[in-house]
From Swiss-Prot:
Protein name (database record): Transcription factor btd
PANTHER family: KRUEPPEL-LIKE TRANSCRIPTION FACTOR, TRANSCRIPTION FACTOR BTD
Chain intervals annotated as zinc finger (C2H2-type): 333-357, 363-385, 391-413
Superkingdom of the organism of origin: Eukaryota
Length: 644
């Protein structure tokens, strides 16, 4: 039973299965089986003689068949379509006759149905097997190299060739393409014997050519397997010898050129659209997409085709646009919803806006299931799940997931920026007024009313004590209030130099590395005592000179007071710049000296925290400052105290 099932599933073993079924019948009817075997052997020798005679007859007709080969293919296709339903009925009737025939009539029935029945006196497998039948010349049975005779209607082409098959087809004579064909041989034998179900003369000639191919393969000592594979010729060009290709599964993938000598009739192989394969698109095949029309359109027309807003529709129709271009010359796209009529410079922006009207939200968050109408909204929403914050504040290093949140946060750091600018402008105006007042004072030689002091950052009652960020301002502040807090006595050598400078009024030049004048440069001092005291506030020695000059005469004291206010104005203006931009404008780019500039960039609130005698009570005048601030004015910009 297992062998019978395997043979049933194998389309090329149906003859072997039929023999097994016949063997089961022989066990039931022993006498009929012996008689039938004798008749089959006699029929076997008869067919062998018919094949030899047909082979001789085919050699004379070979040249005529070469000229009419194309016509035979078309005729055989038509004959196949006509003979297939009739032949199926003949097979069914012959099988029924064989099953019901008595033993005495079995030989005659098998002989009469030799062109239609697959087996001689055996029930054909076509009644049981829906899968394609064996090849056109029968089975490769190991018992006999002479093939049995299935009818031309039950032929099913072998789609994929075997190596022996290909070798047998190559070993055949290439001069005659009919030698590679394998139509049924016994159909031709039945035609010559006068069988009522014989095929047309053209098919009989082709079958004789296949018999010649099998004989040539046998003569070439290829063995029984090569003879069987040559008889299994899988050429599907002669489709008239078998049923239609569309009846078999995967028949559309059977190639035209794999081992076939003639491949002209089966044009639908591989793909039904083979004529359009590897060819450019044409307007005939695709009428909705014409490249020829688009090629001559302008860029504006091609861009306008994709948008169907009222503005683009009017432009394509030749009408004037509803809304002209914007200030950049771009065309505007209008929302067609009544009452909205929003304008967009890009058609994609209008497309996303229309999703807001329709409520369409095609972008889905795979984490929480929320939907969005725009892809960037989905991208920003995804950062809430991943906690990705790429936007960092450069001042406080706080991070945000959106750039607009960062820009809004930055305003919290600079919310009083405008007031600082106003204060700096006021300080500059007051400094300019003080300069004008000083010039008038020099011309007239009389003390004028000192200018009104501006508002200081410290809430102290005495605004100039401990204010200025420079070290020499500490000395200048104590020299202004010398009656309350007198400075320490200078060294004796320094006192002699000071008295000599003020009494003789010689033409001596004093270097001023940190001058408080508007030029901010090194300037020589004049020979007058009043101008030497007015150009003070640069070194501790000059501060002491101004103190002695103020004690000697009331005019000199008034001059020192006015110059004291002017220096405070200049330093206040510079402190505003330091608070605004993080560095002072008076420092040298290469750095400053230690004795007067180490606290040049310090803000007033940090300077107020130092003790009152920070600069005044120091023993030496060229002291190094102990606080950890930088000596370079440009490096002060990166100090944490420098930014507001």
């Amino acid at each position: 039973m297992i062998d019978a099932a395997c043979n049933y599933l194998n389309p090329y073993a149906q003859q072997h299965q039929a023999q097994q079924q016949q063997h089961a019948q022989h066990q039931q009817h022993a006498q009929q089986q012996q008689h039938h075997l004798h008749m089959q052997q006699a029929q076997h020798h008869l067919h062998l003689s018919h094949q030899q005679a047909q082979q001789q007859h085919m050699q004379h007709l070979t040249q005529q068949q070469q000229q009419q080969q194309q016509q035979q293919q078309q005729q055989q296709q038509q004959q196949q379509q006509q003979q297939q339903p009739q032949q199926q009925q003949h097979d069914f009737l012959s099988a029924a006759a064989l099953l019901s025939a008595p033993p005495s009539l079995s030989g005659s029935s098998s002989g009469s149905s030799s062109g239609s029945s697959p087996l001689y006196g055996k029930p054909p497998m076509k009644l049981e097997l829906p899968y394609p039948q064996a090849s056109s010349t029968g089975t490769a049975s190991p018992n006999s190299s002479i093939q049995s005779a299935p009818s031309s209607a039950s032929v099913s082409p072998s789609i994929f060739p075997s190596p022996a098959q290909s070798f047998a087809s190559i070993s055949a004579s290439p001069s005659t393409p009919t030698t590679t064909l394998a139509p049924p041989t016994t159909a031709a034998a039945g035609a010559l014997a006068g069988s009522p179900t014989s095929s047309s003369p053209s098919s009989s000639a082709a079958s004789a050519a296949a018999a010649a191919a099998a004989a040539a393969a046998a003569a070439a000592d290829l063995g029984a397997a090569a003879v069987a594979s040559a008889a299994y010729g899988w050429n599907t060009a002669y489709s008239g010898l078998g049923p239609a290709r569309s009846q078999f599964p995967y028949a559309q993938y059977a190639s035209d050129y794999y081992g076939n000598a003639v491949g002209m009739s089966s044009s639908a192989a591989w793909f039904s659209h083979q004529e359009r394969l590897y060819q450019p698109w044409s307007s005939q095949s695709y009428p909705g997409f014409n490249f020829d029309d688009i090629a001559f359109q302008t860029q504006l027309q091609r861009r306008s085709v994709r948008c169907t807003c009222p503005n683009c529709t009017n432009e394509m129709s030749g009408l004037p646009p509803i809304v002209g271009p914007d200030e950049r010359g771009r065309k505007q796209h209008i929302c067609h919803i009544p009452g909205c009529e929003r304008l967009y410079g890009k058609a994609s922006h209008l497309k996303t806006h229309l999703r807001w009207h329709t409520g369409e939200r095609p972008f889905l968050c795979l984490t929480c299931g929320k939907r969005f109408s725009r892809s960037d909204e989905l991208q920003r929403h995804g950062r809430t799940h991943t906690n990705y914050r790429p936007y960092a504040c450069p001042i406080c290093s706080k991070k945000f997931s959106r750039s607009d949140h960062l820009s809004k946060h930055k305003k919290t750091h600079f919310k009083d920026k405008k007031s600082k600018k106003v204060l700096a402008a006021e300080a500059k105006e007051q400094a300019a007024a003080a300069i004008k007042l000083e010039k008038k004072e020099k011309k007239s030689g009389k003390p004028l009313t000192p200018p009104v002091e501006f508002k200081q950052e410290q809430p102290d009652t005495t605004p100039l004590v401990n204010y200025a960020p420079y070290a020499n301002l500490y000395q200048h502040s104590t020299s202004a209030g010398s009656s309350v807090n007198p400075p320490p006595p200078p060294p004796p050598l320094f006192q002699q130099q000071m008295t000599t400078t003020t009494s003789s009024a010689a033409a001596s030049f004093v270097e001023q590395p940190w001058s408080s004048s508007s030029s901010r440069a090194i300037q020589p001092a004049t020979t007058s005592a009043s101008s030497s005291s007015s150009s003070s506030a640069s070194s501790p020695a000059a501060a002491v000179v101004s103190a002695i000059g103020s004690a000697s005469s009331p005019a000199a004291s008034a001059t020192a007071l006015a110059q004291h206010h002017y220096a405070a104005l200049a330093m206040q203006s510079e402190s505003q710049l330091a608070a605004e931009y993080g560095l002072t404008m008076s420092g040298l780019a290469s750095g400053a000296s230690q004795d007067s500039s180490s606290s040049c960039h310090m803000k007033s609130e940090y300077a107020a925290s130092y003790p009152a005698d920070f600069g005044a009570g120091t023993a030496s005048y060229g002291y190094p400052h102990p606080h950890p601030h930088h000596h370079n004015a440009w490096a002060a910009a990166y100090h944490p105290h420098a930014t507001a």
